[in-house]
Amino acid sequence: MKNWYQLTESETLDKLGVTSEGLSSQQADSLLEKHGKNVLEESKKKSVFQVFLSQFADLMVIILIIAAIVSMFSGSVESTIVIFAVITLNAILGTVQHVKAEKSLESLKSLSSPSAKVIRDGRKIEIDSENIVPGDIVVLEAGDLVVADGRIINNYSLQVNESSLTGESTNIDKSVETIEKEVPLADRTDMVFSGSLVTYGRAIVVVTETGMNTEIGKIATLMNQAKSKKTPLQLSLDKFSSRLAVIIMAICVVVFGLSMFNGMSVLNSLMFAVALAVAAIPEALGSIVTIVQAMGTQKMAKENAVIKDLKAVESLGCVSVICSDKTGTLTQNKMTVQKIYVNGESILENQLDLNIESHRHLLYDMVLNNDSSIVDGKGIGDPTEYALLETFQHIGLDENVLRDVLTRVEEVPFDSDRKMMSTKYKMHGVNHILTKGALDSILDRCVSIATKDGIRPITDEDKAEISRVNREYSEQGLRVLTFAYKESDEALTVDTENDYTFIGLVSMIDPPREESKQAVADAIRAGIKPVMITGDHKITASAIAKQIGIFNDGDIAVTGLELDAMSDKELDEKIEKISVYARVSPENKIRIVEAWQRKGNIVSMTGDGVNDAPALKKADIGVAMGITGTEVSKDAASMILQDDNFATIIKAVANGRNVYRNIKNAILFLLSGNMAGIFAVLFCSIMALPVPFEAVHLLFINLLTDSLPAIAIGMEKPEKDLLRQKPRDPKQGILTKSFSALMLGQGALIAVVTLISFYIGLQTSPAVASTMAFATLTLARLFHGFNCRSTHSIFKLGLFSNMASIGAFFIGTLLLAFVLFVPFMQPLFSVTALTGAQAGFIALLAFIPTFIIQFVKVIAENVRK
């Protein structure tokens, strides 16, 4: 039996039972039911029960379980039951957090899944790649991700990168020629394979295999063995937690020794030391960070910024330079044709006349040398090309009539290096090669010009006048395309794109987005340098940049050629003044990113084309366009803009800053609270006072405060002044000297009121003292959640601006009251009944740290004014 690559195009179509016209919707639905979704099976994930069991694998939990078992055999059954209950509740909470974070990340993956262009019911449409079926006719273009294995049936200079399969990074030239003998995958040039990237050209392909039956599906198991990597912040916190664990274990050894010295039994001393370790080591740090990041990415996704990599969330807060495309990102990407230069004069589109020969050549070039289409009134393809089709319709013509009669013979697709595209059509027995692109790419290739009186040789005066008109249009912020043609029987290649007849210029307007000016102003106020990078003419780009505030007095605009002439040293000297880059190449983009990075900046770069991928990868934050972006650019990016809008980048930066700030505040809350417990225990141990807490107290506090209040802090909304602050220094970690001082200071403050409560309780009995210390520490930490919401006071922030914090506080307080005042709970948690006066005194003491911290914040705010 022959392999797919050994069959001819017609044999492949026959075997699949389809035609080159594509499947019907009914056929596609039937085949989808038969073959299943076009997806790769992922490695089996842990079940919820397995995640739950993994919560008990922590060393501290294992030690605590052993201690609890020993306690049970020594007769302390009630304490053992409570300890096991608290451990189980902790495990349940950890499981819920893990599953929630995992689901959040999974939903983000689905948002960035690729699409494909197929022929269904005789029309070209775009569908999700998972709905591709064997027999589908797929249209591949430069920048597309190949989403299924297929046999090429029409080829237009297709080149594919198959490094994901073969490891070979060079582009492979594809062909329709059948391969008769058996060859390895890398030599199957008449096939395309799922997971490869189209780097050049076009092709029509019939799908032969989908899902796990593709070549990449056969090695999917190996691919799924790769473990997800932790972000730099998570790694930093892991390292910090490990160091802290060593310190706390040393403290626990000291506490164990002092407890023994003060007359506590070996078992109770061990139980207490282990409980202190479990309560003091912030094992919730990792999960809290992941949850806050996941919540942040979900919020960004709702605002049209899909984060592909959690590391991007951390980098967003540090972004100091945004290099943005002009078209579609800063502008509306709604092209409309304005002025047309033909026959030596400027006219409007409604003045085009098919009966005038030069007009007819121009209209044919606009419609035939065009890969976009209009389906049900909706444009499919590049907006610039769509605008050209609309012009054809506006003068009462139907592009489909022309396209049905004339067939494309050959083509050289557009690429960002040549800045032009060419196609060949046979008209009335004569081969016509049609070309459109940038003036500086085409004008010098022209040897003649179409005029009212016919075609004549082009002169230097003609070229000067054409250039003048082009500049005039560009100064008005118009995008200008040049059109030319020739009659020729020679093969159409890059080398034969010459000896053209100039037809005319078509200018289009793509107005700035209404929100772009404000977004640019927000970026500048946030200490971020916005830079425009475009393939348009320098004059056009500068005009648009001035309108939206990117290009200001003293700024410089340079072209790709001018950039090429600069040394790295010259570029480094001028980089901060250059606000507009025009007519740039992919290599230019990489140089721009590197120059800014040499200055110590964190750079965000937008892109939508296949050639943008290297620059997107080089940038700290590569941003791909969700609407106009190629699958190659989306694959290379760490963030995808679903609305292709510059303002969305600024929102994402604000959200990135907010996520980092919330993580920092949550960490402050966890660590300062843990420090309070450690300080209180150490003080009592050193001063030979009774131990202020039972083991079960510390476990309960750990359960109560390390969950809901910390997550609530992570849900804090962005503050109004977030974009008035300078970008964060990426070299500066969370655990700075000032942060550590704040953490220790706040922890000491809470410890002091806890010890005061303990001392007052000792005047009655050790049991009352322990209960009062436990209640004071718990309530003080719950109050402390409001302090850690922000660096601002609660009066400026608004008490009810984060209802999650209010909810976490009341739930925590109710649970504490349940333990303290319900009679059957008291022996379980080793607490005793308190008087109303004692309870009121606890509430007052617990509030004192919050009162002091808020007072200091108010003073600081008044000083800053």
Language-model-detected regions and their locations in the chain:
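Conserved cytosolic headpiece of P-type ATPases
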Residues: 1-724, 734-735, 759, 774, ...
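Internal transmembrane alpha-helical bundles of multi-pass membrane proteins
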Residues: 718, 746-747, 751
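Membrane-water interface at loop-to-transmembrane-helix junctions
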Residues: 729-747, 767-771
